[in-house]
Amino acid sequence: MPQSPRPVPSWALLLRLLALLRPPGLGEACSCAPAHPQQHVCHSALAIRAKISSEKVVPASTDPADPQKMIRYEIKQIKMFKGFEKVNDIQYIYTPFDSSLCGVKLEANSQKRYLLTGQILSDGKVFVHLCNYIEPWENLSFLQRESLNHHYHLNCGCQITTCYAVPCTISAPNECLWTDWLLERKLYGYQAQHYVCMKHVDGSCSWYQGRLPLRKEFVDIIQP
């Protein structure tokens, strides 16, 4: 059974950890491990659809000697897909000011809607960065939008393995091979947009393409 996301420490500590983990010589780089949209949703504490109302640069902590800054985005939450048990209506989200610490730049005061995934810090604030799955809503496929309601959450017990080169094989029956990078040289290609890694009644997992009807073994899992 997938574990619930653990509470994340305060943002000042999180910023320091990001700075320490940044590789030497890559002062302006933000490096993230690849993850399928399904993995992002499963590993995040919350997933919401929202509009950005405004932004403001704020101190990362109350310590006057701390030079770190954060961007506080005021948002209008449209729909919550994950995180009900931890937060209700979200008014603000926070991200590092520096792009080298994976800070996210979002368009404020526009009609653009976003899918936002992120962490909930120990003080209750919502923290997002470039290693989360953050996409303009209009860029999501029909399957991705529908899967935010059901399929992604219900199949967090499946493991998705990124395939970079051949040979590339699974090591367990609950794995799905993610081949977008191998075939298209980009992460969010056709497979990320149109497939979900779904669990069968026997515990194994395989890719399900959204435009095809669900097979009985999938239905038995989703509707016991």
UniProtKB/Swiss-Prot annotation:
The keyword Zinc applies. Residues 30-156 form the NTR domain. Disulfide bonds join C30-C102, C32-C131, C42-C156, C158-C205, C163-C168, C176-C197. Its main location: secreted. Residues 30-33, 99-100 are annotated as: Involved in metalloproteinase-binding. Zn(2+) binds at C30. The record marks K69 as: Involved in metalloproteinase-binding. Pfam families: TIMP. GO terms for biological process: negative regulation of membrane protein ectodomain proteolysis; response to cytokine; response to hormone. CDD domains: NTR_TIMP. It is found in: Secreted. The keyword Oxidoreductase does not apply. Belongs to the protease inhibitor I35 (TIMP) family. PANTHER family: METALLOPROTEASE INHIBITOR, METALLOPROTEINASE INHIBITOR 4. This is Metalloproteinase inhibitor 4. The lineage of its organism: Eukaryota, Metazoa, Chordata, Craniata, Vertebrata.
